[in-house]
Amino acid sequence: MNTLLMHCRPGFEGEVCAEIAEHAATLEIPGYAKSKPASAHVEFVCQDADGAERLMRRLRFADLIFPRQWARGPGFIELPESQRIEVLLAELASYPVCGSLWLEVLDTNAGKEVSTFCRKFEKPLRAALVKAGRLQEDPALPRLLLTFRSGREVFVGLAEPRNSALWPMGIPRLKFPREAPSRSTLKLEEAWHQFIPRSEWDKRLAPDMLAVDLGAAPGGWTWQLVNREMRVTAVDNGPMAENLMYSGLVDHQKVDGYQYRPRQRVDWMVCDIVEKPARTGALIETWIGEGLCREAVVNLKLPMKQRYAEVRKILQRLRESFDARGLKVVIGCKQLYHDREEVTCHLRRLER
């Protein structure tokens, strides 16, 4: 199992290559990354047979920015038109018994077509795996991840459930709320799922908390905060959706989001403004560093080139700034499924 397969947003294969190559070099695990433009996946081929397993053991998946999902295996294999299950059972003879099964496809137009095949194939495959003793429901065992590039080509991979994506392919199935004024609302909801354990939502996303939404109009992110019954200051020169204003929980301030400062410390600051990432990074540094908020979710809009390098530079600057202030801040950064040319940062200031 010398190959690490990683899913990603189409067009960001180069960022995944740069990110995993940097980590592998730091960990002294030799190998090379390979990908094709807009293929929505990257393979990192390790020189050592156990290289992919070592990478997954040494890295936290949650700390990776651009990969949506990962799995280790020997690479893609060919399947015949018939007797696919028999071929897969033979391939799995050298694998450990697995505790769960996910059939995955790539986030491409071709992948959408393959998903129909996967839905039909999963039931008989699952039954055959259970009968052969290759699959038993046990969250402590590795997850079997079968990534189909077509009905005839599959990556037979493994991953630990607690150190891989929360959802198949790293894609959450969130329902757009009809009352929300824009689809951007799903970005904030996905961020909460990604960065906050579900068991902590009632404590960290509680009613009557104070929140500030910078660049709020028309109110996609504000809607999520109001839906949690928070009291929100919506900062934007543009108009807010009327249904949000009728809630009685929103104070609309028509000022520049980068200039606004709250009169008192708030629980949450969220921001989805189209601006250069360095300026938004400085905004984060101020709000968290000066204690204006306890937690923040902020989108960084990415440049056309050197996107991974730019994000890494901003995150490093934030860490150095907080360290210099003697602050303990948990920082997370991920390109979410609902993100486009951007990444989402989550920051939580902890009291020492």
UniProtKB/Swiss-Prot annotation:
Gene Ontology CC: cytoplasm
Keywords carried by this UniProt record: Cytoplasm, Methyltransferase, rRNA processing, S-adenosyl-L-methionine, Transferase
Domain of life, source organism:
Bacteria
Q: Which residues cross the membrane?
A: none
Q: GO:BP terms for this protein?
A: methylation; rRNA processing
According to UniProt, the reaction catalysed is: cytidine(2498) in 23S rRNA + S-adenosyl-L-methionine = 2'-O-methylcytidine(2498) in 23S rRNA + S-adenosyl-L-homocysteine + H(+)
The record's subcellular locations are: Cytoplasm
Q: Name one GO molecular function term.
A: S-adenosylmethionine-dependent methyltransferase activity
Binding residue positions for S-adenosyl-L-methionine: 184, 217-220, 236, 256, 272
Q: Which coarse location class applies to the principal site listed for this UniProt protein? A: cytoplasm
* Enzyme superclass (EC): transferase
Q: Give the protein's function.
A: Catalyzes the 2'-O-methylation at nucleotide C2498 in 23S rRNA.
Q: Which HAMAP family match?
A: 23SrRNA_methyltr_M (MF_01551)
Which PANTHER family has this protein been placed in? RIBOSOMAL RNA LARGE SUBUNIT METHYLTRANSFERASE M, RIBOSOMAL RNA METHYLTRANSFERASE FTSJ DOMAIN-CONTAINING PROTEIN
Identify this protein by name. Answer: Ribosomal RNA large subunit methyltransferase M
Q: What organism, scientifically named, is this protein from? A: Pseudomonas aeruginosa (strain UCBPP-PA14)
Q: The organism's lineage?
A: Bacteria, Pseudomonadati, Pseudomonadota, Gammaproteobacteria, Pseudomonadales
The encoding gene: rlmM
